[in-house]
Amino acid sequence: SSVQANGNNMFVMFWNSVWYSCGGAALGVFTSSVTAYVVAKYKFPGRGFIYGLALVTMMIPIVGSFPSQYKVYTALGIIDTPLLLITKAAGFGFNFIVLFSFFKTLSWTYAEAGFIDGASHLKVFFRIMLPQALPVIGSLFMVAVVQLWNEYMEPNLFLQSYPTLSSGLYIFQLEMT
């Protein structure tokens, strides 16, 4: 016999929570690390704007942006699909600020040595800079996983066909009271 809440198998909800949390965290930390590296190490017009945008995203309350998010996701046709995970860059602002600070303090001589050896910009990032940032990335990944694992509102609104444990436990609690 399976454990059910409102007709949904709890093991399926557990799997949905795992892919939502780990996938969203991995995607969020990866995009933050690439963006933070480029903004911290390369000089181009708009660097300050990107940094400011990351700060602003931390100031906007998430709940206040749900109506506009729902409208955009509906227009894109990604409501109730796993593609919604692409938009879920968990904690982008916080991750970006932490990684930006890390890459800003990292010496550029490592990259110069890679360039002298014939490495491309991508190879320098993936083979030299990213491995040095792995402790920071690991910490941010764990924080993002916990944040997404505890998320109730967004999966409940945008991924109704993929219920997570938090929504299943809420339904279970409602049935028991």
Q: Whereabouts are the PLM-identified features?
A:
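A structural signal for multi-pass alpha-helical bundles of membrane permease subunits
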Residues: 1-177
